[in-house]
């Protein structure tokens, strides 16, 4: 037994000798640190994504942010050198930040993604949607233009670009972009939803410009295409009828709006203005009361009368 122990000890020593002789070495503290960072990254990423799916956005943001820290990501560095796992975390983090309303931070993550994947159209679509919520129409235009360099015939990008133009007061380009979006969307069977969005915005814009006939054409198309009543479309038709001086028909469509959404404050407000213009003070007062119940913050500023164009007299 003593002899066997000596042999075992010798084997251990020989192994150590050969390891040193041939350049082998035990795992360094730096290697262990990297292994631990990789494990931390995976755990934090998994926990962050799971928290997102459970609607726990605060915890998701914390986990995903710490996952980037575990990877020792340089936020000021070149994102094009980041690996796919880091980019996936940025993608999830941008979504969580959007859900939380942290739009500027979400935009920063999307900007890093766009640096790493400049040919990914969907990144620019999301950037445009985020900047629209931020009301930063210049940045929104820039994001749309970047996306359209990748695909100039994307109907949704054209729709977003139109909204950016409208936000900057460029009505001519708004109509032009919407018209192009409609033509492209209507060529595709699956493009009906986008065509509806673009037609609705174009109809609303044309009506504001005083082009009642053009707005009516869009509204008629929408009413024909949609199987179920849509509040915004009914509201557009009501306003068109009012602009045409057809008060009773307009009231009929405001009634339909309220049937679809009993809490449509704007429908009560505008219908009340028509009742007042017709001399029906009883119904005008009822609509005004309904409107103020939904907007109690305006009650102190209202005298109780509506102007015919749909605005209440204020003190």
Describe the function of each predicted region.
Residues 53, 99, 133-134, 167-168, ...:
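Register position in tetratricopeptide repeats
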Residues 69, 111-115, 145-149, 179-183, ...:
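Conserved structural position within tetratricopeptide repeats
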């Amino acid at each position: 037994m003593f002899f066997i122990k000596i042999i075992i000890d010798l084997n251990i020593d020989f192994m150590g000798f050969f390891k040193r002789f041939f350049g082998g070495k035990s795992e360094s503290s730096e290697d262990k640190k990297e292994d631990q960072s990789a494990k931390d990254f995976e755990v934090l990423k998994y926990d962050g994504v799971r928290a997102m799916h459970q609607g726990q956005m605060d915890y998701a943001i914390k986990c995903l942010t710490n996952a980037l820290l575990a990877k020792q990501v340089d936020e000021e560095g070149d994102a094009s050198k980041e690996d796919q796992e880091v980019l996936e975390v940025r993608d999830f983090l941008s979504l969580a930040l959007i859900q939380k309303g942290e739009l500027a931070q979400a935009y920063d993550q999307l900007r890093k993604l766009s640096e790493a994947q400049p040919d990914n159209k969907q990144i620019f679509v999301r950037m445009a949607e985020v900047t629209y919520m931020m009301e930063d129409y210049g940045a929104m235009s820039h994001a749309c233009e970047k996306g359209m360099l990748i695909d100039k015939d994307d109907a949704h990008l054209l729709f977003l670009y139109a909204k950016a133009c409208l936000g900057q007061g460029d009505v001519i380009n708004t109509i032009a972009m919407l018209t192009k979006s409609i033509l492209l969307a209507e060529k595709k069977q699956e493009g009906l939803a986008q065509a509806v969005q673009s037609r609705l915005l174009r109809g609303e814009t044309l009506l504001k410009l005083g082009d009642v006939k053009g707005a009516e054409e869009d509204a008629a198309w929408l009413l024909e295409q949609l199987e179920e009543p849509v509040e915004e479309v009914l509201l557009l038709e009501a306003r068109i009828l009012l602009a045409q001086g057809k008060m009773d028909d307009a009231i009929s469509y405001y009634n339909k709006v309220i049937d679809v959404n009993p809490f449509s404050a704007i429908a009560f407000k505008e219908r009340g203005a028509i009742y007042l213009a017709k001399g029906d003070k009883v119904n005008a007062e009822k609509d005004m009361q309904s409107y103020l119940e939904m907007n109690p913050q305006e009650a102190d500023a209202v005298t109780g009368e509506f102007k015919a164009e749909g605005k209440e007299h204020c003190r």
